[in-house]
Design a protein with these regions (language model features):
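Short low-complexity stretches enriched in small and charged residues
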Residues: 9-13, 35-39, 46, 115-121, ...
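N-terminal pre-ligand scaffold of iron-sulfur
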Residues: 1-96, 100-107, 152-155
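Residues at helix-coil transition
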Residues: 51-52, 99, 125, 213, ...
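Short linear motifs in intrinsically disordered
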Residues: 58-66, 142-143, 274-279, 313-315
């Protein structure tokens, strides 16, 4: 794999940390008001800006595997329909007929054209209105005025990003910044979908996302899963994209120590068994990437601050259908990841209940949790509030401890 040398350097960084008993760190610990998880006004601003005004990573190229493919989702109260036309180009539309706003498609599949199930108006895969049943009833209709509502979309490096309204700017290279060549080497489109699971929990979407952003909890919370293979409280942290709002975390496994006895020239693809690689793509995506499997998490706000939905889609590379990185088949690996997330979401739900009690005024992110600090500062900037304007950053006695 072309990116093997990139990750050899990452391995060497982690080995240095493991030997020294340290981790990549922020300059200091950081206190965040609990209201960022519970305040309805802040929650409404997040939905209106962070989600509606920012491009979203919605799926992989392999979810539209051939000409005529379509893929639908309705994750942010905006029903979206993706198509791949006969030239191979991806389009994004509001999943609504322009006659009377009926939904055009459900799920995913393949089709030669789009026909409205309500009154049989017909559109091509580029969103052009081509047929009106009983057209004489509409007089001299100008079909060009009834093309599907187009949404911005870009496909690159095997990923598809889209905007939830027509004015959103989508530039994959701008989103990924200097990490774009690394994602290009991963070629996430060369994958096969395995399975999907959804969680709907009584917790804030950011609380659920927090668990992807530090390894400090591995040994305590995941004793029977990740804790059995991981080196806790150690990670290599890097930022990328606009204002460094995205990040990559590499968590070493205990097995990484074996590489100290093996010459670097002999390191091969099996080094990817020695660490876990997690990417956060603003505002709500966590990607666990390896040469064998990709775990794609999308986290969405619910109807109020204390509700959220996590969508987990698991993929394997088309050339590695038999075994996952942990030696299991793809379905068994999918079920293992679901078990890990179950352990985390239980904690997120009880934390939310405690925060709603109104007596824990701050959450504290240690210096050993730089990704959490970086991500939450980005969220504040995203709603027009800089961290310097909020009562954050000074560490003292935590309320109610």
């Amino acid at each position: 794999m072309e990116n093997l040398n990139v990750y050899k350097d990452l391995i060497k960084r982690m080995l240095t940390m493991v030997d020294a008993g340290v981790t990549d760190s922020a300059p200091a610990a950081y206190r965040q008001p609990s209201s960022v998880y519970t305040d309805p006004a802040l929650f409404a601003r997040e939905k209106a800006t962070i989600f509606k005004d920012e491009p979203q990573l919605v799926c992989f190229s392999s979810d539209l595997p051939e000409k005529g493919s379509y893929f639908t989702f309705d994750d942010l109260d905006v029903p979206v329909l993706l198509t791949r036309d006969n030239d191979g180009k991806v389009h994004a539309f509001l999943n609504a007929c322009t006659h009377r706003a009926a939904r055009l498609k459900e799920g995913c599949g393949k089709t030669a054209s789009l026909s409205c199930p309500y009154h049989n108006w017909g559109f091509d895969l580029k969103g052009k209105l081509r047929a009106v049943w009983e057209e004489k009833s509409f007089g001299a209709i100008d079909k060009s005025l009834y093309d599907l509502v187009r949404l911005p979309v870009e496909e690159k490096y095997g990923m598809i990003f889209a905007g939830m309204h027509p004015d959103v700017k989508v530039s994959v290279d701008e989103i990924l910044g200097h990490m774009a060549p690394v994602f290009e080497m991963w070629d996430l489109g060369a994958t096969r979908f395995v399975d999907q699971h959804e969680w709907k929990l009584k917790t804030n979407w950011k609380l659920a996302l927090d668990t992807f952003c530090e390894g400090y909890h591995f040994l305590a919370l995941h004793k029977k899963t990740l804790g059995g293979i991981s080196i806790g409280n150690t990670s290599a942290f890097d930022t990328f994209g606009p204002e460094g709002r995205n990040h990559r975390l590499a968590f070493p496994n205990e097995s990484i120590k074996r590489l100290k006895e093996i010459p670097e020239a002999e390191w091969g693809m099996d080094i990817f068994n020695d660490f876990q690689l997690v990417h956060f793509v603003y505002p709500n995506i966590s990607l666990l990437v390896s040469p064998v499997s990709i775990e794609f998490f999308k986290l969405y706000p619910g109807e109020n601050p204390g509700e959220h939905r996590t969508v987990f889609r698991s993929y394997v590379r088309s050339t590695n259908d038999e075994k996952g990185w942990d030696g299991n088949d793809p379905q068994a690996h999918f079920e293992f990841i679901c078990k890990v997330v179950d352990e985390e979401d239980w904690v997120s739900a009880n934390v939310m209940k405690n925060l709603n009690a109104g007596m824990i005024n701050f959450s504290t992110f240690g210096a050993n949790e730089p990704a959490l600090q970086n991500m939450h500062k980005a969220f504040l900037r995203g709603i027009g509030t800089t961290p310097e304007e909020a009562p954050l950053g000074k560490v003292g006695a935590v309320a109610s401890c």
